[in-house]
């Protein structure tokens, strides 16, 4: 490993530890179970899963560091000149699915790729972001989530938050449904334009912001009573989450195409999901308001 890779790895392992600790404390019941694994083709990771807690129905916070002799198609699709290069990929990826339908699902990811070829300069980039998927929308939560995202981006330029917010809205769009997966946040990839030190600082700012963005929302909503019908709606909306992850998500596709660890890759899927044929929310209902108002391309910081 190069000194750059070592620095990124040390940060990611510490980030995984800190996020797991914060989530365990908030749950107050369940604890993460760690599964350390080794990849035959090169590398390994620490999968940490949690479930059946007071707050968290299912969740995972994964660290992986894998390497190989050739980049898979999902990683080189936008940069065909890198096809066939050896690579290292490091990242922390997490998804939290709460029991209570009033608590949104959250997802975050920070990652580092380096692609090498003998006799040529190494090419590296960072990617990541975080996004929120509510089932019952609340403006206060949406504004808070995006405010924390904006504050994390602010030291790196006034254009960074709007640029990566818009990218998130485009990326987490379920094309065959014509709707977004959630209310967005930040998404970026192929980031190397600022030089390594600044890009690495940005990744740390985004990784460190996740807990500040998510836990205040959890604390406000986790004790809200809910009905069996609301739980059913949550499971129906979770189906959209599954559809996006299995059809479009670059991280999922990269993991599967590179011979990654299937259990860790599919950790993001919720434990209980529902599909109903041509199901529609009742007009004027909270359920209808989710798609009509909250799941729209909206500037939440203009409120």
Swiss-Prot record:
The record marks 176 as: Important for dimerization. The keyword Metal-binding applies. Substrate binds at residues 93, 109-111, 259-261. Residues 241-276 are annotated as: Important for dimerization. GO terms for cellular component: cytoplasm. One of its GO terms (biological process) is protoporphyrinogen IX biosynthetic process. Its main location: cytoplasm. Its EC number is 1.3.3.3. It comes from the Bacteria. SUPFAM superfamilies: Coproporphyrinogen III oxidase. A divalent metal cation binds at residues 97, 107, 146, 176. Its cofactor is a divalent metal cation. Involved in the heme biosynthesis. Catalyzes the aerobic oxidative decarboxylation of propionate groups of rings A and B of coproporphyrinogen-III to yield the vinyl groups in protoporphyrinogen-IX. NCBIfam families: PRK05330.1. Belongs to the aerobic coproporphyrinogen-III oxidase family. This is Oxygen-dependent coproporphyrinogen-III oxidase. The gene is hemF.
